[in-house]
Amino acid sequence: MALNSSAEDGIKRIQDDCPKAGRHSYIFVMIPTLYSIIFVVGIFGNSLVVIVIYFYMKLKTVASVFLLNLALADLCFLLTLPLWAVYTAMEYRWPFGNHLCKIASASVSFNLYASVFLLTCLSIDRYLAIVHPMKSRLRRTMLVAKVTCIIIWLMAGLASLPAVIHRNVYFIENTNITVCAFHYESRNSTLPIGLGLTKNILGFLFPFLIILTSYTLIWKALKKAYEIQKNKPRNDDIFRIIMAIVLFFFFSWVPHQIFTFLDVLIQLGVIHDCKISDIVDTAMPITICIAYFNNCLNPLFYGFLGKKFKKYFLQLLKYIPPKAKSHSSLSTKMSTLSYRPSDNMSSSAKKPASCFEVE
């Protein structure tokens, strides 16, 4: 959406250079429907994740801290999703006022950064637990995990401030509708470039490189362990899970990041073609559905890698209350083999162990 400032008389009034861009009847039906599905599935799934981790598993492991915070971040975003569903169903007419516009926009941005940062920390934790289990034991503590999560929430909040400051309700004069949108007073403003690049680099590129590196090193360590322990049957599920984690993250966010970058070029006036604007504005909500639906499934995806998580999850569905005492490990299907190449262990000591655990 390319917007031009026209007048200001108490209400911020603007002109839309491409008033028909992204405004299609199927979008106004399909997107609210998808938002509703994401809301129901996300609220149900993430609420159960919070209950299982906090009440059944008693929040005793490093990874459980990250997964709990991941689910909480998703719930914060999901609570604002009905607003966006109504907004889209009303053909991009925002009826909720300026304050909710800022809050809902900040929630979307906050969830993006918090989720990505938490997944990145989870990948680093898995790398340390599997490749350097002994050396990292003193560093991988509950205190460190909780402090890390506090820092992540602060960083995500800081990264979301531009949405609070610059996202506002505007009245578009040439279409007679009120929208919740970013608007830059000058085409020469460096703000959209900064926000777009921050979202592309800090919200995707750097985290993806760290996640890719962490799981690649885990992959290599496990392959080396299998070569040493040739008598042990190879479990290819481990490698499929690693591949799924990396590809799941990549393909969830790449479409949204690409169209975010194109939207910045439109806002800057680099792209003037309304046909391209229409493609971008039409694709943007679809990429948001892909990214945030997968985002909201992440706690379930990572949680169900653990046998104990699945056990407690099924207990919860059967209304079986948690026991007074609970085991402290959240093991995963990847817990069949470990390799400690940097812990100076003798070859005789390199035995299969349940160290590919979310612990």
Curated annotation (Swiss-Prot):
Amino-acid positions noted as binding angiotensin II in the UniProt annotation, renumbered to this chain: Q15, D17, R167, F182, H183, Y184, K199
Protein topology in the membrane: Multi-pass membrane protein
SMART domains per record: 7TM_GPCR_Srsx
Lineage top rank: taxon: Eukaryota
Keywords linked to the UniProt accession: Cell membrane, Disulfide bond, G-protein coupled receptor, Glycoprotein, Lipoprotein, Membrane, Palmitate, Phosphoprotein, Receptor, Transducer, Transmembrane, Transmembrane helix
Annotated S-S bridges: C18-C274, C101-C180
Alphabetical GO biological process terms: angiotensin-activated signaling pathway; blood vessel development; brain renin-angiotensin system; calcium-mediated signaling; cell chemotaxis; cellular response to dexamethasone stimulus; dopamine biosynthetic process; drinking behavior
SUPFAM superfamilies linked: Family A G protein-coupled receptor-like (SSF81321)
Pfam family, one: 7tm_1
Transmembrane region(s): 26-55, 62-89, 99-125, 142-165, 191-216, 240-268, 279-304
Extracellular side: 1-25, 90-98, 166-190, 269-278
Tissue expression profile of the protein: Is expressed in the liver, kidney, aorta, lung, uterus, ovary, spleen, heart, adrenal gland, and vascular smooth muscle cell.
Major localisation: membrane
Subcellular location: Cell membrane
Region Disordered, residue ranges: 337-359
UniProt GO molecular function: angiotensin type I receptor activity; angiotensin type II receptor activity; bradykinin receptor binding; D1 dopamine receptor binding; protein heterodimerization activity; protein kinase binding
UniProt-annotated glycosylation sites, renumbered to this chain: N4, N176, N188
Cytoplasmic compartment spans: 56-61, 126-141, 217-239, 305-359
Residue ranges, compositional bias (Polar residues): 337-349
Lipid-modified residues, S-palmitoyl cysteine kind: C355
Modification after translation (UniProt): C-terminal Ser or Thr residues may be phosphorylated.
Functional description taken from the UniProt entry: Receptor for angiotensin II, a vasoconstricting peptide, which acts as a key regulator of blood pressure and sodium retention by the kidney. The activated receptor in turn couples to G-alpha proteins G(q) (GNAQ, GNA11, GNA14 or GNA15) and thus activates phospholipase C and increases the cytosolic Ca(2+) concentrations, which in turn triggers cellular responses such as stimulation of protein kinase C.
Binding partners and assembly: Interacts with MAS1. Interacts with ARRB1. Interacts with FLNA (via filamin repeat 21); increases PKA-mediated phosphorylation of FLNA.
Official protein name in the record: Type-1 angiotensin II receptor A
